[in-house]
């Protein structure tokens, strides 16, 4: 039988929440606005499936390039290339740097 290679495959621990963080995230996280040039970390929230970037970008840091509706276009370095990913604000955290 062929092995399944879905969007969330091999994410058993990556898309798991700790017991104290279970449930929905605060509403302010969904309403967060970023401006062009902001440094953001891609931190996937498994309780929100909409606007979730591919799990391989979890933990990466990128620059906000533009806003697409309620989502943001983030430029992330993947290997030697820059890739643009579209993510909702629930999956982004502002960098402290």
From Swiss-Prot:
Residues covered by region (Disordered): 1-24
Keyword flag Transcription: no
Protein name according to UniProt: Large ribosomal subunit protein eL21
Gene, per the UniProt record: rpl21e
InterPro entries in the cross-refs: Ribosomal_eL21, Ribosomal_eL21_arc, Ribosomal_eL21_CS, Ribosomal_eL21_sf, Translation_prot_SH3-like_sf
GO molecular function: structural constituent of ribosome
Family as reported in the entry's similarity comment: Belongs to the eukaryotic ribosomal protein eL21 family.
Alphabetized UniProt keyword annotations: Ribonucleoprotein, Ribosomal protein
GO CC, one annotated term: ribosome
UniProt-listed GO biological process terms: translation
Skewed-composition ranges (Basic residues): 9-21
């Amino acid at each position: 039988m062929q092995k399944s290679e879905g969007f969330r495959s091999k994410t058993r621990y990556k898309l798991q929440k700790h017991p104290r963080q279970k449930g929905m995230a605060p509403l302010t996280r969904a309403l967060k606005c970023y401006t062009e040039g902001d440094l953001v970390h891609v931190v996937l929230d498994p309780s929100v499936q909409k606007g979730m970037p591919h799990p391989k970008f979890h933990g990466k840091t990128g620059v906000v390039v533009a806003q697409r509706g309620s989502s943001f276009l983030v430029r992330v370095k993947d290997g030697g290339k820059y890739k643009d990913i579209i993510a909702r604000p629930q999956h982004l955290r502002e960098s402290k740097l």
